Structures are given as C-alpha cells and as structure tokens.
Amino acid sequence: MKVLRVNLDEKSYDIVIQKDLKDYFGEYIKTVFDGKKVAIITDDNLNDIYGEAIKKNIENEGFEVEVISVTPGEKSKSFSVLPGIYNKLLDFKLTRSDLIIALGGGVVGDLAGFVASTFLRGISFIQIPTSLLAQVDSSVGGKVAVDLERGKNLVGSFYHPELVLIDPNMLGTLPEKYFNDGLGEVIKYGCIKSKELFEKLEGFENKEDLKENIGEIIYECCNIKREVVENDEKDLGERMVLNFGHTLGHAIEQIYNYEIYSHGEAVAIGMNMISKIAEEKDLTKKGTAERIESLLKKYGLNTDVNIEDNGLAREAIKLDKKNLNGNLNVILLKDIGEGYIYNTTVEFFE
C-alpha cells in the first residue's frame, strides 16, 4: 500500500493506492465519514460491473447507500443531467452531513464532484477513480466541472475530496481505448515534470510491461500532481503546466463533438502538435517533439489531426481557461521534463 498526503491550507486529504482496495472501501470510508447516508454516483457500465458489490461493501459498515447511475460518456457532464441527479438525492433525503462518492472515470469524477460542491451548498465527497486517466490525474487536485456547448469544463469550482481511493486492479475491466486514453496523461507528466518517468516509459518493452508496473506509475503521477497542487492550488501559476497539450486537446474534443477522440487521446495529439510548433519557433529543444511522437505511437496513441482553417478551433482556444488578462498562456517544454508557461496570443497557432 502507498499513501500520499495532499497538504493544503484549507483542506488536506490522503490518496490511498493499493491493489484489491475495493474489498476495503467501506472500512476506509469509515475513517473519514461518520454520517449515515452515502450516495454513489457512477455510470451504467461501472454500475453493472461494480455497483452492487461496492454498495454491499459500504452497507456492511452500517451506512445507508443509494446508487445513482448516468449514461457513460462526456455528454453526461452537462447541465441537462444535473436536475435528475439532484432530484434523486432529494428523494434519498441526503443532507449536508452525508456523503457523495464519485465511482468512475474522469467524467463521473468531474460530474459527481460538481454535484457535491453545489447540492445544498456543498456536501463531502470521496473519489474512487476507476479509469487510468482518473487515477493518475483528474481525481486529484479538486477541480470539478461540467461542460457547456461552447467548451469543456467552463462551469466548475475547486472542491477537494475527503479521500481518494485507488485500486489499480479495477483497470482490468477498462477497455483498451481508455487505458490508452490514460496513458496520454501519464506521458504528459513525464513531459512536464519528470524526465525519469518519460525515460522509464521509453524503456518499457511494451504496454504489457508497463501494465505490470502500473501501481508504481500511478503513484509517480499522483505524487507529481500533489506537489504541483500544493504549490498552486487555484491554477494561477505553476499548476498551469499540468495543462500541457490541453489547449489544442480541448479544441480537438470539441471539433469532433466528443465522439471520436477521448480526452487523453486529444491531449496526446495536442502535446505532439504544440511541441512541433514550439520547435519551429525555437521555443523547445530540437528533437523533443520527435521523442514525444515516438512514445505516443509506442503506446497506440494518435499524434496528429487536421484542424487547420477551423473557426471552431480558434473559438475554443480563445475560451481556454489559461487565458488571463487578454493573453493566452500556452504550456511548452524547454526539454523533456521541463514544462513552462509561455505568454502569447491565439495567433501562436496560425
């Protein structure tokens, strides 16, 4: 078992990483929650696989448990889904002294976290991430949000969980496409903060070799994010480097209506494309983009897509949350393991 402590001024919490942790979820929940009712928000796929077993596991600790399931996919992370969830919480008579659990990948984590932050002006919640992307990235750091038609994550808040429970063995039910999706974020961490991690990923013989070491990889990624979040909780400085590849990535997701490329796949393309642009402008060490592209391809990720002359891409970039005071902050690399913030305008991409 590995435990990381996220230490923040107003709220601190543990990230627990352990194979087969799902058999002990109820026990761990009891260490941070002494109320009566627990509402689990998940999606239909995960509910079919884990819902009943996890519900019983938590009930065995004396809690009253309700499972609320949504349609899988990014389109559930929208305002149209919220009233249905709020009404089910009201039917369950959930109070501010009760608990919400986010059981799922990045979409469920963002959605359930947003519900927790807004229902009755705020209810405690726990993250139980089940996808690689959520385990290494989105479950840590307190960002919760829903999408608007004009862009991703445009309405949200910073709302930290009481606890993050990560069972790497739950990745065994994850479709390969979404394992690759998470690898996009894993590679990002190596790019921005850890040359050692990047080279470790280069050194694995293949994806199966990586999977045998997945617990260690998850720990390294969470530890990097923990350090960054502790230094810049509200995303006004250093934390922006975590968005390497995301400016173009979010635009790609939006252009394809969230149906072709998953978040991690789009970020992978964004990292490759922006590194090539930066090299052409002598803002990134020559050869960096080639190494990134090679590593992405090694793990089955796309590296390019045509978004030229697309007005929607330009508008999506303008709405990027790293835009401050009329300027666009893009995340570039000096070299592998050295991400930095570069102040520019949308014309950078033209």
Swiss-Prot record:
Binding of Zn(2+), residues: E185, H246, H263
Subcellular location: Cytoplasm
Entry keywords, A to Z: Amino-acid biosynthesis, Aromatic amino acid biosynthesis, Cobalt, Cytoplasm, Lyase, Metal-binding, NAD, Nucleotide-binding, Zinc
GO cellular component, one term: cytoplasm
Pathway field: Metabolic intermediate biosynthesis; chorismate biosynthesis; chorismate from D-erythrose 4-phosphate and phosphoenolpyruvate: step 2/7
Keyword GTP-binding: no
Keyword tRNA processing assigned: no
Class of this enzyme: lyase
Family: Belongs to the sugar phosphate cyclases superfamily. Dehydroquinate synthase family.
Protein name per UniProt: 3-dehydroquinate synthase
Organism expressing this protein natively: Clostridium perfringens (strain 13 / Type A)
Lineage of the organism: Bacteria, Bacillati, Bacillota, Clostridia, Eubacteriales
